[in-house]
Regions:
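C-terminal flanking tails of non-heme Fe-dependent oxygenases
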Residues: 1-64, 70-248
Length: 248
């Protein structure tokens, strides 16, 4: 097993052969680890830092309290992450030997997106050890910015694998919907978040989903992991699949 993958997405905009190189890196990480770190992602660090700070205040005040500038920052950050989601899907399409716009044309032209701030409350257990919050990724992509003191792990073949701390990086994880679409070529693995200190953890969790009504037909010939993927996927529409996921 090699180290946890880190990908510089800024190279994707330079053009060939860098575009192909990044696409190959994304394809390898998504099919092996089901997750990867992103640097050079183009998300304004000052916007991220501001939202993390405001998110801490938001958690303390409660969701019903007014917080000047908070909702504007949320919308701006979500807009930036939506653009990042589209770029990632273009890189994945290229890595799968498809047109860059394949996913946008068929699934994500009008994506459903959501952003959660401080969505992983953690209390210290008896003895001072941090409790752990396990999360099953149920969407197309999830892009996480971890707050101070937070750490993430991905359940790999050999057990829980620590995601290294990399300043400014975002953690992207593959959701079951994308595993289905790629017929098991991409892996959707459990992840969990924990923290090393007490108090709130205003991590930012952005979810990128296919548009409602998009026909989720698995792509053929992508080397499915037969032992881990259920046989006989039937064609579903995004709304029906998300409803099923929410019920589990």
């Amino acid at each position: 097993m090699t180290g946890f993958p880190s990908i510089d997405l800024s190279l994707f905009d330079i053009g060939a052969p860098w575009r192909d190189q990044v696409a190959a890196q994304v394809d390898s990480a998504a099919s092996s680890f089901g997750a990867f770190l992103l640097v050079g992602h183009g998300v304004d660090s000052s916007l991220t830092d501001s939202l993390l700070e405001l998110g801490g205040k938001y958690v303390k005040r409660g969701s019903g309290a007014e917080l000047p500038g908070f909702h504007d920052s949320v919308r701006e950050y979500a807009t930036s992450l939506t653009g990042l989601g589209h770029k990632l899907m273009a890189a994945m399409a290229r890595g799968l030997r498809l047109d860059d716009g394949f996913f946008a044309d068929h699934y994500t032209g009008n994506p459903r997106v959501s952003l959660r701030v401080g969505d992983y409350p953690v209390a210290l257990s008896a003895g001072g050890q941090p409790d752990t919050d396990e999360a099953g990724n149920r969407r197309l992509l999830t892009i996480l910015k971890l707050g101070d003191g937070a750490r993430a792990q991905v359940k790999y073949d050999e057990g829980w694998l620590d995601v290294p701390a990399l300043p400014g990086a975002l953690l992207c994880t593959i959701g079951p919907v994308l595993q289905r679409l790629t017929d098991g070529h991409y892996r959707s693995l459990p992840r969990r978040l924990s923290r090393s200190v007490a108090g709130e953890r205003p991590s930012l969790c952005f979810v990128f989903e296919p548009g409602m009504g998009a026909a989720l037909t698995p792509l053929a010939g992508l080397r499915p992991r037969a032992a881990e993927v259920e046989a006989g996927y039937r064609q579903l529409r995004a709304g029906a699949l998300l409803t099923q996921s929410d019920a589990t």
